[in-house]
C-alpha cells in the first residue's frame, strides 16, 4: 500500500508526519488514526508487527493534541498497545495479543478499547458460506478464544470497552452486522446483555468524545432511537433481526423503511477480503 487505496496516507519520516497530521486536521478530520501495527510477508509471530516507533507515535499525539484533535490507533500486539498508551493515544482499536505489562497499563490508564471482533467472528462462524478455508476460520476463531479472557479481565477492571463493527468489508457489509459485536461481547467475553448494550451506546459516545450528543436517552441529546419487537436483555440477537426492528428514529425523525432494501453491491477492491470469495450477508450466513 503506497497510500493510494482508500483514505490512507503513508508517511516515511518526521517531516512527512508533521505535514500529514496538519493537512488532515486543516481539512476538518475529527480524529487522526494511526495504523500502529501491520502484517508483513513471512511473518512468524501472532498478531501484527509494530511499524511505528514510540517517538513517531508521540509526535503524532502531541501535534494532534496541540491542534485539538484526538488520536486513535489500530493496534494488534503488546508493544504497540504499550507504546500507544505511553505516547498519549486517546483510544485503541483491537488491542489483541496483550502481555501482562500491557494489560496492567490499560487497566491503570482506563484507555478505551474497541476489540472489533465482528470480522473474526463472522469468518470463524460463517466463513464456509463465502469460500473461506478451514485454516483461516480456525486462525480467526483462535484470536477470539485467546483474547476473550483478557478483555473480560480489563472490563471487570473498569476499562471502557466499546463495540466496533468493522463494517464495509466484504465479510461485514454495511447494514448487516452492526449488532454482531454485542453478541460477541455476551457470548465470548462474558458480559451481560445490558453491559454489551452499554458498550455500544454510553461507553462508545464517551470514547469518541460525543457524550454530550449521543449514547443515552436524556433531555437535550439527539433522539436516535431503535425500537424493537422483543427484549434484547433476554436475547441480544434481536438487535440484528430486521423483522424485529419496529421503528428507527434519527435525530427525532422516524426513518421510513417501506422501500425495498437496496442490493448490496461489491465493495471497493481494497475492501475485498483475501480470505473469502463473496459478500457475507445475514441471508447467506443462515443458509
Task: List where the protein language model places each region.
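Alpha/beta enzyme core
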Residues: 21-34, 40
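His/Asp/Glu-enriched, well-ordered alpha-helical/loop segment
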Residues: 66, 143-231
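Short, acidic/polar
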Residues: 12-25, 75-80
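Active-site mouth loops of central-metabolism enzymes
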Residues: 1-19, 70
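Active-site microenvironment of metallo-dependent hydrolases
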Residues: 156, 201-287
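Conserved, mostly hydrophobic/aromatic
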Residues: 28, 32, 64, 166, ...
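Active-site core of metal-dependent hydrolases
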Residues: 36-149, 162, 167-169, 188-191, ...
Amino acid at each position: 500500500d503506497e497510500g493510494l487505496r482508500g483514505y490512507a496516507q503513508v508517511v516515511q519520516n518526521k517531516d512527512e508526519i508533521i505535514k500529514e497530521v496538519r493537512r488532515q486536521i486543516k481539512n476538518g478530520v475529527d480524529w487522526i488514526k494511526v495504523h500502529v501495527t501491520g502484517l508483513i510477508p513471512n511473518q512468524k509471530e501472532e498478531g501484527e508487527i509494530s511499524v511505528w516507533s514510540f517517538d513517531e507515535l508521540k509526535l503524532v499525539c502531541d501535534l494532534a493534541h496541540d491542534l485539538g484533535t484526538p488520536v486513535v490507533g489500530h493496534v494488534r500486539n503488546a508493544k504497540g498497545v504499550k507504546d500507544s498508551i505511553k505516547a498519549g493515544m486517546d483510544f485503541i482499536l483491537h488491542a489483541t495479543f496483550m502481555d501482562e505489562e500491557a494489560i496492567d497499563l490499560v487497566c491503570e490508564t482506563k484507555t478505551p478499547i474497541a476489540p472489533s471482533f465482528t470480522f473474526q467472528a463472522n469468518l470463524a462462524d460463517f466463513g464456509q458460506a463465502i469460500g473461506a478455508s478451514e485454516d483461516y476460520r480456525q486462525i480467526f476463531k483462535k484470536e477470539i478464544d485467546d483474547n476473550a479472557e483478557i478483555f473480560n479481565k480489563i472490563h471487570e477492571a473498569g476499562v471502557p470497552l466499546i463495540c466496533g463493527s468493522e463494517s464495509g468489508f466484504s465479510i461485514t457489509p454495511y447494514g448487516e452486522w452492526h449488532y454482531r459485536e454485542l453478541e460477541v461481547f455476551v457470548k465470548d467475553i462474558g458480559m451481560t446483555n445490558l453491559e454489551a448494550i452499554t458498550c455500544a451506546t454510553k461507553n462508545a459516545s464517551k470514547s469518541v468524545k460525543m457524550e454530550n450528543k449521543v449514547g443515552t436517552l436524556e433531555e437535550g441529546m439527539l433522539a436516535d432511537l431503535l425500537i424493537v419487537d422483543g427484549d434484547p436483555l433476554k436475547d441480544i440477537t434481536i438487535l440484528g433481526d430486521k423483522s424485529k426492528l419496529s421503528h428507527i428514529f434519527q435525530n427525532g425523525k422516524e426513518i421510513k423503511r417501506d422501500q425495498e432494501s437496496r442490493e448490496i453491491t461489491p465493495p471497493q477492491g481494497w475492501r475485498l477480503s483475501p480470505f473469502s470469495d463473496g459478500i457475507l450477508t445475514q441471508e447467506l450466513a443462515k443458509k
